[in-house]
Design a protein with these regions (language model features):
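Active-site core segments that coordinate phosphate-bearing ligands/cofactors
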Residues: 3-5, 17, 109, 116-130, ...
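Residue-level signal for inorganic ion chemistry
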Residues: 23, 49, 78, 105, ...
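Surface-exposed, flexible loop/turn segments at secondary-structure boundaries
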Residues: 23, 33-36, 86, 95, ...
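N-terminal glycine/serine-rich phosphate-binding loop of ATP-dependent small-molecule kinases
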Residues: 1-98, 110, 114, 153, ...
Length: 490
């Protein structure tokens, strides 16, 4: 018995096969081998052809089935993870009407800002937990105003994962978690946000049928089975956006738990047990994969643009030439906690939402030309990145979240002892590092949705925990002092 998981990203589509009994990934593949193209007709625009996702999914599926050597009839369920916030528009024949306006397209910002002001900030935050912002509903408002003939042909709107599920099953449906990320969900009414639809002039009929995140959401059609080399009738039993799915992949389901990534940009995704919001909209809040009205589980999402990109900049411009990241970490470790007074603000990769969309740039403070060297700068860069995470976590704590544990994949900045020890020391949280990824998580989510696993604890019982980092009490005061000095610069 095997589970097939797809991760539909903007750069590639990854497929993984998981043995349901052992919980182990037996094969993975991705397409394309270089980054998928993103079309930018104008500055700030970003579009992709949904048919490209399907083509890449077919190629990845063929590779993963060939590599595994298993029979197609042994695939028991399929799960989907996908890039969040993208808009896909289809007509009554399920034909795509225009390229998808994807997550990093900013053309809809003015529409969301206007809606936030005219509907009322308090109402939006209380009901949507967010500003309408640059999310899917605002993208659709742009289409309505700028492409009215095309808009009149829209039968249903979908997120990227909904589109892939439609291609697999022929059924058009979505989830509460998906609707919440598009700003289509009213948390007070526990229903579609009619007030936002009315404001933008959308008919409720464009919203697909709603299915539970963990449930049968359709079965593979004969045509899809032929295209993918699978068998007809395999159920699709899970779908979620990439950030809630990353949390699921790390077995983050309960209030106080955090899933984090620290690549070029960073993400802190914390689970809250109440439907609360940040009054300054510095973080976003969506329905987590296990959210229900009676047992709320919301995902509070913080993005930090200046994460690994700062570390790579330091490698190119400050570190000795030819040095590896591991060697750079060793050099940085020669500096003490707090980098002997040097502070770096890692905000050089665009506006930061947690700073209320201010674009403050990267800056270096406290350098003494007589006493500081490369090692102080390299350590201060990593500490500055961690301190930006801490600053965001404080916003979450202000929303009533009690942060106890941080789960992360053993990759990118989490490979650095300085980074992970600083994060544990300044937050007081235990850090657990795992070997997993989004497509494997989607496969295990499918196992939950199909009833193969009774719950998440059974599904992730074999999740490999590679390392546990506990805060060192003796160092916490030094981390706290360095953080407070850093925070004075914001």
């Amino acid at each position: 018995m095997f589970l097939l998981g797809f991760d539909i990203g903007s750069s590639s589509v990854k497929a993984s096969l998981v043995n349901a009994e052992s919980g182990k990934c037996v094969a993975s593949a991705f397409y394309p081998k270089s980054e998928a193209p993103i079309t930018a007709v104008q500055a700030g625009w970003a579009e992709q052809d949904p048919a490209m996702w399907w083509t890449n999914l077919k190629l990845a599926t063929a590779d993963v089935m060939n590599a595994s050597g298993i029979k197609a009839c042994d695939v028991s369920a399929i799960g989907i993870s996908y890039q969040m916030h993208g808009l896909v528009c289809v007509d009554k024949d399920h034909q795509v009407l225009r390229p998808s306006i994807i997550w990093c397209d900013s053309r809809a910002v003015p529409y969301g800002e206007k809606a936030f002001k005219e509907i009322g900030e308090e109402k939006c935050l209380k009901h949507l937990l967010n500003s309408p912002g640059n999310f899917t509903a605002s993208k659709l408002a742009w289409v309505k105003e700028n492409e009215p003939e095309l808009f009149s042909c829209i039968d249903k709107i979908m997120l990227p994962g909904d589109y892939i599920a439609m291609r697999l099953t022929g059924e058009v449906c979505t989830t509460v978690s998906g609707l919440s990320e598009g700003m289509f969900w009213d948390f007070q009414k526990n229903d579609v946000a009619d007030f936002l639809l009315d404001y933008y002039g959308f008919d409720r009929s464009v919203i697909p049928a709603i299915r539970p995140t963990f449930s049968e959401q359709g079965r593979i059609t004969a045509q899809a089975a032929t295209e993918l080399g699978l068998v007809e009738g395999i159920p699709v039993t899970y779908r979620a956006g990439d950030q809630p799915n990353n949390a699921l992949s790390l077995n983050v389901f309960n209030p106080g738990e955090i899933a984090s990534t620290a690549g070029t940009s960073g993400v802190v995704y914390g689970v809250n047990g109440v439907t609360d919001y940040d009054p300054l909209s510095r973080v976003n809040t969506f329905a987590h994969v296990n959210h229900t009205a009676n047992n709320p589980r919301t995902g509070v999402l913080l993005c930090i643009n200046g994460t690994g990109i700062l570390n790579s900049w330091m490698k190119r411009n400050v570190a000795p030439e030819g040095i590896s990241y591991a060697e750079m970490n060793d050099l940085a470790a020669q500096a003490p906690i707090g980098s002997a007074g040097v502070s770096i603000m890692p905000f050089g990769n665009g506006a930061e939402r947690m700073l209320q969309n201010r674009e403050v740039g990267c800056s270096i403070h406290g350098v003494n030309f007589n006493t500081h060297g490369k090692h102080h700068l390299l350590r201060a860069a990593q500490e500055g990145i961690v301190f930006s995470f801490k600053y965001g976590i404080e916003i979450m704590q202000g929303m009533g979240m009690n942060i106890s544990k941080i789960h992360a994949g053993n990759a990118n900045m989490f490979l650095s002892p300085i980074f992970r020890n600083t994060l544990a020391g300044v937050t007081g949280a235990t850090i657990e590092l795992y070997d997993t990824d989004g497509s494997v998580g989607a496969a295990k989510g499918a196992g939950i949705g199909a009833g193969i696993y009774k719950d998440n604890n059974e599904a992730f019982a074999t999740l490999e925990k590679l390392q546990i980092i506990e805060p060192v009490e003796a160092d916490r005061a030094a981390y706290a002092d360095a953080y407070e000095r850093w925070k004075e610069r914001i």
